[in-house]
Amino acid sequence: MRHATLYRYQLPMDSGVILRNEKLTQREGFIVELTENGRTARGEIAPLPGFSRETLEDAGLQAQALLEQWVKGHAIEWDAQHPSVAFGLSMAHYELEQALPEQGNYYVAPLCTGDPDELLPVLNNLPGQKVAKVKVGLYEPIRDGMLVNLFLESMPDLTLRLDANRAWTPAKALKFAQYVAPSLRSRIAFLEEPCQSPSESIAFSIDTGIAIAWDETLQEAVRDADFALENLLGVKTIVIKPTLIGSVYRVEALIEKAKTLGLQAVISSSLESSLGLNQLARLAHKLLPNEVPGLDTIGLFRAQLETPWPNSSLPVVALQEQSIVWRSESSL
């Protein structure tokens, strides 16, 4: 017996969340719920504004059409769907197959925002491997460089992951690097997408010795029918945001290929709700158990959805309180 429900959720965001220069006041998305043979599983479909090509409406319509096929017993062609739809539906399918472990990798790289004087004690108290993330490119590159230098200089055992979201011209990227001491640059694990083109980013890495990572470049490349990971040269790390990449099966294959190429792979969030974030933590535990995932985004929300994130004090809203967009009537 198969049954499916499609919910639409809305969650309030913290006032300071800005995506591609647009303020995000609430996060909207869908939760798909699949039931088969007495087992129920869920997945989150939430296109990321400014990053996903598909709109929320596009995703909802496609999800409903696929669910109508699924309850009739049809298989889903994952790679033919919008990435957010493929990921959310496949995650529910994956959980239904009992392929997703109960245990999750909740040791995440904390996202550093706010006053450095307040952050340093927090980072000092991190257990084990001290890895943190800093968003750069929002302010002047000199300020960013000085801040990164301060963190690395103050904590000799700290490693930083930086994300510029292609904000810099080559000149601005080099200006940033000038304010990070050469002796400290090796503790920048990677800098995601410093410049507006991959070739500029690679040139920056060669000039400065700062390792870079592909994020948007990977998202764009996987859309090509002839995509091959080995063609994405010049980096040692790929950042995988499943909502922007596609199905969980595609994510699995991408990680396996990265391993054969000697690339580091990191699973990262696309501002999923606590429900989706918990599933990403479980997926990270299964596929990359020794890698710190980039999932420290729950603090950007003002509420959680159904499944609370460990140690978060944010209020939790029930899935049943969200609107039902579609529900199957008959099933096999």
From Swiss-Prot:
SUPFAM superfamilies: Enolase C-terminal domain-like, Enolase N-terminal domain-like. It catalyses: (1R,6R)-6-hydroxy-2-succinyl-cyclohexa-2,4-diene-1-carboxylate = 2-succinylbenzoate + H2O. Its EC number is 4.2.1.113. The keyword Magnesium applies. Mg(2+) binds at D163, E192, D215. Pathway: Quinol/quinone metabolism; 1,4-dihydroxy-2-naphthoate biosynthesis; 1,4-dihydroxy-2-naphthoate from chorismate: step 4/7; Quinol/quinone metabolism; menaquinone biosynthesis. The keyword Magnesium applies. Its cofactor is a divalent metal cation. The active site is at K135 (proton donor), K241 (proton acceptor). One of its GO terms (biological process) is menaquinone biosynthetic process. One of its GO terms (molecular function) is O-succinylbenzoate synthase activity. It is an enzyme of class 4 (lyase). Keywords: Lyase, Magnesium, Menaquinone biosynthesis, Metal-binding. HAMAP family: MenC_1 (MF_00470). Converts 2-succinyl-6-hydroxy-2,4-cyclohexadiene-1-carboxylate (SHCHC) to 2-succinylbenzoate (OSB). Belongs to the mandelate racemase/muconate lactonizing enzyme family. MenC type 1 subfamily. This is o-succinylbenzoate synthase. It comes from Vibrio cholerae serotype O1 (strain ATCC 39315 / El Tor Inaba N16961). The gene is menC.
